[in-house]
From Swiss-Prot:
This is Bis(5'-nucleosyl)-tetraphosphatase, symmetrical. It catalyses: P(1),P(4)-bis(5'-adenosyl) tetraphosphate + H2O = 2 ADP + 2 H(+). It comes from Shewanella putrefaciens (strain CN-32 / ATCC BAA-453). Hydrolyzes diadenosine 5',5'''-P1,P4-tetraphosphate to yield ADP. It comes from the Bacteria. Keywords: Hydrolase. CDD domains: MPP_ApaH (cd07422). GO terms for biological process: RNA decapping.
Length: 274
């Protein structure tokens, strides 16, 4: 069995199919792992979600910020923008089933035997594996409740949850986990999150900011960390234990697939624009 990890698809369904053809992906034998942000901006978020849902146990995804934003739009908590490119998905007959499927997806997944962890944006350097499991499980539990829109989604939008507080309770605790695992790029030297800078490290002019993965972390030493979210990196992190897979397909660049067992990246150029 092969494990394939794909970067932010964001509705680029044709490119996803093309890159899977290149490796002869067989869902009866192989697994497709996705770093989240299956939807938004690209031309066919509906087909993308339907495809991943149809794969059953052969697909393993985590939630990204755009996936959570889709829940907010569907729940009438946010309005969709033209740039979201979600109208066909929101009007689909099976939208409720697709949202329910998304709600079952976690913020982190792991392959313990490979010492591999996958999240959308990364892992806070302060966190141990036990903390990562615990905090992501709290968010997953909240998403599966009937009142998830009121109790979680309606309250998750804030830039104030930028600092890890181990004693925090309720929504404050969940907010930090969502921010860290789905939105994080840079940290200040004291460890709190910065949400403004999205440039690659070589273009960041604030001396107080460093990419999250440059801080000392027990998980960075022991595990391979697979993530997406940060298209400006274009996969360039110069560390064999970091797999940055968002390479900007929805922005006209390419989609990246990583074959775990061969430690090989396969790419597909963007074929059409939304």
């Amino acid at each position: 069995m092969a494990h394939y990890f794909v970067g932010d698809v964001q509705g680029c369904f044709t490119e996803l199919q093309k890159v899977l053809e290149k490796v002869d992906f067989n869902p009866s034998q192989d697994e497709l792992w996705a770093v989240g942000d299956l939807v938004a901006r690209g031309p066919d978020s509906l087909a993308t979600l339907r495809f991943f849902k149809s794969l059953g146990d052969s697909a393993k995804t985590v939630l990204g910020n755009h996936d959570l934003h889709l829940m907010a739009i569907h729940g009438k908590l946010k309005r969709d923008k033209p740039s979201d490119n979600l109208k066909a998905l929101l009007k689909a007959d099976d939208i409720n089933e697709l949202i329910d499927w998304l709600r079952q997806q976690p913020l982190m997944r792991e392959l313990p035997e490979q010492q591999l962890i996958m999240t959308h944006a990364g892992v806070p350097p302060q966190w141990s594996l036990e903390t990562l499991r615990q905090e992501s499980a709290l968010v997953s539990h909240a998403l599966k409740q009937d009142d998830y829109l009121e109790a979680l989604i309606s309250q998750m939008y804030t830039d104030s949850a930028e600092r890890w507080e181990p004693t925090a309770l309720g929504i404050a605790r969940l907010r930090f986990c969502i921010n860290a695992l789905t939105r994080m790029r840079y940290l200040y030297v004291d460890g709190h999150l910065n949400f403004d800078c999205k440039q690659p490290p070589q273009d960041c002019t604030d001396p107080q900011l460093r990419p999250w993965y440059e801080y000392t972390s027990p998980l960075r030493q022991s595990h391979t960390l697979v993530f997406g979210h940060w298209a400006a990196l274009m996969g360039n992190v110069n560390d064999k234990k970091l797999k940055a897979l968002d390479t900007g397909c929805c922005w006209g660049e390419h989609l990246t697939l990583w074959h775990l067992e061969k430690d090989q990246k396969i790419t597909q150029k963007r074929l059409k624009k939304s």
